[in-house]
Each structure stands twice: as C-alpha cells, then as structure tokens.
Amino acid sequence: VTVQADTVILRMLNPELLANHEKAAAALAGADVAVAAMRTSLASQLLDQQAVQARATSDWRIAEVKNQAYERAHVAGVISALALRESRITEEQQHRRADIERQRVAASRQNMAAQLRAAQARSDEVASTLAIAQQQVAALDVRAGIDGI
C-alpha cells in the first residue's frame, strides 16, 4: 500500500472531544436560529413603532389643517378666540407627539442594531468554539509526513 503525504494513516478517538464538537455544532445552530428569530422579532417591533409614528404624523397633519381652518373662521368671526386657542394647543400637542414618535423610531432602529450586533457576537463566539473543537478532533488523525509505502 502506498501513501501520500498528508494521508490519514491512523484515526484516534476521544469521546470527550467528539462530544464537545457535537455540542459546539448544536450550540452554533441554536445561536444562528436565535439571531434570525431576534432579527424577525425586532423588525416586527420596528414596524409596529413605525405604524404608531405614521398615526401620530397623520393626527398632527389633521390638527394642522383644522387649525388653519379655525384661523380663517376666527378671522371671519365665525368661531371664538377660545376655540381657536384650543385648536392651536391641539396642533402643538400633536406636533410634539409626532416628533416623539419619530425619535422613538430612531431609537428603536439603534436598539435593534445593537441587539443584533450582540446576538451576532454571541453566535461568532460559539462559531469560534466550534472551530477549536474541529481542530481538536482533526488533531486526532495521524497523517503521513511524506510519500511512502
């Protein structure tokens, strides 16, 4: 029988190393699934927050249009100064609310990115553990150093 350099000539077994390799492979699969699940969950939360922002912006725009109509009606003497003031206050409140919701969406995006980076870092750590386990298992193989018989 001839062998070439780097041919496996003896395969040793170490049940502990093999078990560690299997555990690391399973942990990596779990970590990857966790990252994907987190990404989906956070994207859904972001969409919910964006829907709230859209509603707040819509409410503000409606209040803005109503306030403009109230201003014209007040100039024409159709509504009181009190009704106009209430309309202005409502518009200001809705504007502030829309701004807050916009800030929340921005904060949600930053939070989402940070959480995903952390989850990916955990996954990368597990991948590193798996790579080490693979190297340890591969080191159990005795290979020919040169071509021979």
Predicted segments — roles?
Residues A19, K23-T40, S44, A51, ...:
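Extended amphipathic alpha-helical segments
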Residues V1-Q45, V75-A83, I149:
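Long, amphipathic coiled-coil "stalk"/hairpin helices in large membrane-associated assemblies
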Residues H74-V75, A138:
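Short polybasic/polar patches that bind polyanions
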Residues E64-N67, A81:
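Short, surface-exposed alpha-helical segments at coil->helix boundaries
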